């Protein structure tokens, strides 16, 4: 199932300027999600990272993956109305820079889901090429 930005805002508490997802292309609650982030030159971070050579910081790619994973978790009926907090990060790797004009495709597969936590593997791609990956842990509250 696809989600619009309005539907994403019904699931996640994040708002501008920190809601990093523009759309969810597919979500299977409790299993996986595919989301998009359109990287634009107007994003405030590019004023300082880096002037004349804008590059999306890796931490924002990881946060985008975490928000996508949170959608997969919080779409489950038992977690409706809850918040997913970042609980941990392992094996993060960055393979290519992300710049204005890129569209990040964010894929997260949930590997474990418990009553108060979840774990997943995330991959971020641009034009079909892997730009980042990480294992993510979520705490649900």
Swiss-Prot record:
- Subcellular localization: Cytoplasm
Q: What is its main location?
A: cytoplasm
> Enzyme class, one word?
lyase
Q: What is the catalytic activity of this protein?
A: a (3R)-hydroxyacyl-[ACP] = a (2E)-enoyl-[ACP] + H2O
Listed InterPro entries: FabA_FabZ, FabZ, HotDog_dom_sf
Q: Which domain of life is it from?
A: Bacteria
Q: Which residues form the signal peptide?
A: none
Give the GO cellular component terms, alphabetically.
cytoplasm; membrane
Q: Which GO terms describe its molecular function?
A: (3R)-hydroxyacyl-[acyl-carrier-protein] dehydratase activity
Q: What's its EC? A: 4.2.1.59
Biological processes, Gene Ontology terms: fatty acid biosynthetic process; lipid A biosynthetic process
- Keywords (A to Z) from UniProt: Cytoplasm, Lipid A biosynthesis, Lipid biosynthesis, Lipid metabolism, Lyase
Q: Which cysteines are joined by disulfide bonds?
A: none
Pfam families to which the protein is assigned, alphabetical: FabA
Catalytic residues (UniProt): 49
Q: PANTHER family given for it? A: 3-HYDROXYACYL-[ACYL-CARRIER-PROTEIN] DEHYDRATASE (PTHR30272:SF1)
What does the UniProt function comment say about this protein?
A: Involved in unsaturated fatty acids biosynthesis. Catalyzes the dehydration of short chain beta-hydroxyacyl-ACPs and long chain saturated and unsaturated beta-hydroxyacyl-ACPs.
Family label: Belongs to the thioester dehydratase family. FabZ subfamily.
| The protein, known as | 3-hydroxyacyl-[acyl-carrier-protein] dehydratase FabZ
Which species does this protein come from? Enterococcus faecalis (strain ATCC 700802 / V583)
Lineage at the top is: Bacteria, Bacillati, Bacillota, Bacilli, Lactobacillales
- The gene behind this protein is fabZ2
């Amino acid at each position: 199932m696809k989600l619009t930005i309005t539907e994403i805002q019904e699931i996640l508490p994040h708002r501008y300027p920190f809601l990093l997802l523009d759309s969810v292309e597919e979500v299977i609650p409790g299993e996986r999600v595919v989301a998009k982030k359109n990287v634009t030159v107007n994003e405030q971070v590019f004023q300082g990272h880096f002037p004349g050579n804008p590059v999306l910081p890796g931490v924002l790619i990881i946060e985008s993956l975490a928000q996508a994973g949170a959608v997969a978790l919080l779409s489950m009926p038992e977690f409706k109305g809850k918040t997913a907090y970042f609980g941990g990060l392992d094996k993060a790797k960055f393979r290519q820079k992300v710049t204005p004009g890129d569209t990040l495709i964010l894929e997260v597969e949930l590997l474990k889901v418990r009553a108060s936590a979840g774990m997943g593997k995330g991959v971020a791609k641009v034009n079909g090429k892997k730009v980042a990956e990480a294992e993510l842990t979520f705490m649900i509250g």
